A protein has these predicted regions:
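A conserved mid-domain beta-alpha-beta active-site/ligand-binding segment of alpha/beta enzyme cores
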Residues: 206-264
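Short amphipathic alpha-helix with an adjacent loop that forms part of the alpha/beta core around
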Residues: 142-154, 177
Length: 423
């Protein structure tokens, strides 16, 4: 993961705490990803391709602690090694992780530093085999990489594209659409510096041309920027909400979840958007977000459906600042808030389907508009069961009484005697 101002010419580049949050999300997600995919005892091989489109030099120095910090290439490689050990610890039938990694970096100092760091850390023998180094723009290499993934894994094309661009212009949405259209098993983790875009957004011709080139010109539903600024109290959040919805629509993913990361300067939000074609992948990433988040933003305004987003703000990181915030655990507060919101939304959705729907269908059809994980969904449903607003039953008719009992195939439906409060 690299930004243009990082400098590897004299050693590891300097990295700030808010950027390390991206590394933490990636590390935690890869660990869960391998556990999820490698759980079948009958598997022999797990094929996967990891693509780091903006790899950087692989090593950083923390701006505050001065400690050495590993970048995304080594996070990927370490995740593979650790997963292979963990997955085979209690297996009778060995599982081989057949993972290829593509590390693309256009800047010469960063590329040379990464190549040297890989050799110094014992990965030299894999370069040209499982590790593919490319000194190039990601956009120029993407077609060849997509073809190589499809050749290795024709049916699913299982892969994760880590696209930590600087700014918002280096990854065309048309390219992301092609990834999903060509590789059904692909996932994309995209960095999008929304505040950098907001700095320049206006009603001028230059901005409108830029939005058109980014395929974001429909984000504001025909309203001008001047009109939005005059009529919306939180106009920045209102504009971000429109941009996010347009971004998701243009990328072509069925399932997605955003995570914001805030720089210490106040604004400076950028998004880490995970996109996939399967709701299970989305849920795994959401679980990671709930592990790492320490802040919450309500996006939206008049004329837009409200949605919420978890995120990371270094000012709220007790480990980073060395102070504990007594009496306040954000995770518990945000979790309770999400359960309350779901309890308000679920009844009308469920009552509109008199025959009910499966839990899996409920989650898959609504999860994109909520920061909640499947576990939080289950907790909200059980709260409604206890209040006799709904009922959850298994395929054989067993009534579910606790969140841990709910399975994807269970039917969520109105009770035989409906509440008069639902209209």
């Amino acid at each position: 993961m690299t930004e243009h101002h990082y400098d590897w010419s004299g050693g590891p580049a300097v990295i700030k705490q808010h950027s390390i949050a991206k590394h933490n999300v990636l590390r935690a997600y890869l660990a869960r990803y391998f556990i999820t995919l490698g759980c079948s005892p009958n598997q022999d091989v797990l094929k996967l391709t990891l693509v780091d489109g903006f790899a950087g030099g692989g090593e950083y120095t923390h701006s505050d602690t001065k400690q050495l910090v590993l970048g995304s290439p080594f996070i990927c490689l370490d995740a593979v090694r650790e997963a292979e050990f963990a997955l085979n610890a209690n297996r009778h039938k060995p599982l081989k992780l057949d993972v290829h990694c593509y590390f693309i970096e256009k800047e010469r100092p960063a590329f040379l530093y990464l190549e040297r760091a890989l050799r110094d850390r014992g990965y030299g023998h894999q370069i040209g085999a499982e590790i593919h180094l490319r000194r190039a723009n990601f956009h120029d290499e993407a077609e060849n990489i997509i073809d190589a993934i499809r050749a290795r894994n024709p049916r699913a094309g299982r892969s994760i594209f880590i696209l930590d661009q600087y700014g918002y212009k280096n990854v065309p949405f048309s390219l992301i659409r092609k990834i999903f259209a060509t590789l059904p098993g692909a996932e994309v983790v995209l960095t999008f510096n929304v505040d950098s875009l907001l700095t320049y957004v206006s009603d001028g011709d230059v901005t409108q041309e830029m939005l058109s080139n980014l395929e974001l010109n429909g984000a504001f539903c025909g309203r001008t920027i001047e009109e939005i600024k005059k009529s919306e109290r939180d106009w920045r959040l209102f504009i971000q909400s429109g941009l996010y919805r347009e971004l998701i629509q243009r990328c072509g993913a069925k399932h997605y979840t955003p995570f914001f990361i805030r720089s210490p300067q106040g604004h400076g939000d950028y998004w880490l958007v995970h996109m996939s074609q399967h709701h299970r992948a989305r849920d795994v990433m959401t679980e990671v977000h709930w592990e790492i988040q320490n802040h919450f933003i309500h996006y939206g305004g008049s004329g837009l459906e409200m949605f919420e987003i978890t995120g990371y703000d270094p000012d709220y990181d007790s480990l980073a600042i060395g102070q504990h915030r007594l009496g306040f655990e954000f995770d518990d507060v945000a979790r309770k808030q999400s359960i309350r919101t779901l309890k308000e939304q679920f009844p009308r959705y469920i009552y509109a389907r008199p025959d009910g729907l499966s839990f899996g269908e409920l989650f898959a059809s609504t999860c994109n508009g909520s920061p909640a994980s499947a576990e939080i969904y289950r907790s909200a449903l059980i709260a409604l069961v206890e209040e006799r607003v709904i009922e959850v039953v298994s395929e054989d008719g067993a009534v579910r009484r606790s969140a841990s009992q709910i399975r994807n195939t269970d039917c969520v439906r109105p009770p035989a005697q409906r509440s008069l409060l639902i209209t």
